[in-house]
From Swiss-Prot:
GO terms for biological process: regulation of DNA-templated transcription. InterPro entries: Integrase-like_N, TACO1_YebC-like_2nd/3rd_dom, TACO1_YebC_N, Transcrip_reg_TACO1-like, Transcrip_reg_TACO1-like_dom3, YebC-like. Pfam families: TACO1_YebC_N (PF20772), Transcrip_reg (PF01709). Belongs to the TACO1 family. It comes from Yersinia enterocolitica serotype O:8 / biotype 1B (strain NCTC 13174 / 8081). GO terms for cellular component: cytosol. The keyword Cell membrane does not apply. Keywords: Cytoplasm, DNA-binding, Transcription, Transcription regulation. It is found in: Cytoplasm. The keyword DNA-binding applies. This is Probable transcriptional regulatory protein YE2395. One of its GO terms (molecular function) is DNA binding.
Length: 247
């Protein structure tokens, strides 16, 4: 299955991610603690925890750090009042945007999220306003350079749902989100080395952005990700190579 450039992937990743490494680690640790608190410390029986572990390792977090976070969650000593909140809204260019948060203060979080939407010309929606456009999936990503047929055969044998090969040669393998850990283990066993693995919300439709709306969407994502309460931002915006070259 052919795909567009990685620039137009489901989630925008900042090029200067290293500058936000500390904040990224803080958010991953918060998710590890919460997942372990809610579902226990065994990743084999806790898909949410397994997904958080895969994400932590993809971001080069040490085993010691993630194990301490899991122990905190199982012990129930910290972050025991954190709750997952999903906000939905419309961004620039009619894009559908989903914002996944972990928060101990709903009023603070919704205020920050609403402010980001308002400042970039979007608006915060009600529950169900755009969520029907997204499906929760596991995503295992591979860097360019692998043989497409080899990845496809291994992925299908492992129980994957779909494979997308992008113009730059990168490959994403999609799974049921609950099966992410098992499928990744099976692919690892074949010798394929994944660049990353995570649970994501995949849009069923795309909204094409132009030179005016694309920068506004990227600003919205930046503002949302700057919030300590925001864990993930998903959207259905698509930026063509031509528009991307002007940014």
């Amino acid at each position: 299955m052919a795909g567009h450039s990685k620039w137009a992937n489901t989630k925008h990743r900042k090029a200067a991610q290293d500058a936000k490494r500390g904040k990224i680690f803080t958010k991953i640790i918060r998710e590890l603690v919460t997942a372990a608190r809610l579902g226990g410390g065994d990743p084999g029986a806790n898909p949410r925890l397994r997904a958080a572990i895969d994400k932590a390792l993809s971001n080069n977090m040490t085993r010691d750090t993630l194990n301490r976070a899991i122990a905190r969650g199982v012990g129930g000593d910290e972050d025991n009042n954190m709750e997952t909140i999903i906000y939905e809204g419309y961004g620039p260019g009619g894009t559908a945007v989903m914002v996944e948060c972990l928060s101990d203060n709903r009023n603070r979080t919704v205020s920050e999220v609403r402010h980001a939407f308002t400042k970039t010309g979007g608006n915060l929606g009600t529950d169900g306003s755009v969520s029907y456009l997204f499906t929760k999936k596991g995503v295992i990503s591979y860097a360019p350079g692998l043989e497409e047929d080899a990845v496809m055969d291994a992925a299908l044998e492992a129980g994957a749902d779909d494979i997308v090969v992008y113009d730059d040669g990168a490959i994403d393998v999609f799974t049921a989100w609950e099966s992410l850990g098992a499928v990744k283990d099976a692919l690892d066993a074949t010798g394929l080395v994944a660049e990353g693995a995570e649970v994501s919300l995949i849009p069923s439709t795309k909204a094409e952005l132009d030179a005016e709306t694309a920068p506004k969407l990227l600003r919205l994502i930046d503002m949302l990700e700057d919030s300590d309460d925001v864990q993930e931002v998903y959207h259905n915006g698509e930026i063509s190579d031509e528009v991307a070259a002007t940014l």
